[in-house]
Amino acid sequence: MTTDQIHSKLATIIADKVDSHIAPEQVTLDSRLREDLGIDSLAVAEMLYEIEEVFGATLEVSDPQTLLTVRDAVNAIALELRLPVAN
């Protein structure tokens, strides 16, 4: 799996979680989860659950501030799966 594939799947998960009806194609690596996409702490928790289901990767996020952008989440998943990270 590549980081592009991770991004594509994660964009779909995120698009399902936000209330503003964002299309997966609008979720870029540099999209900020809270500011740009409107993801709140409950949606982050749901997103982490779905990440575990879809990717088999458990992200230990003790501080939600460690996942500020989609790129942060993609890289966290890639590291968990022992894959190269997105630049």
Residue ranges of predicted features:
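Phosphopantetheine-dependent thiolation modules in NRPS/PKS and related acyl-activating systems
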Residues: T2-D36, A43-Y49, E53-N87
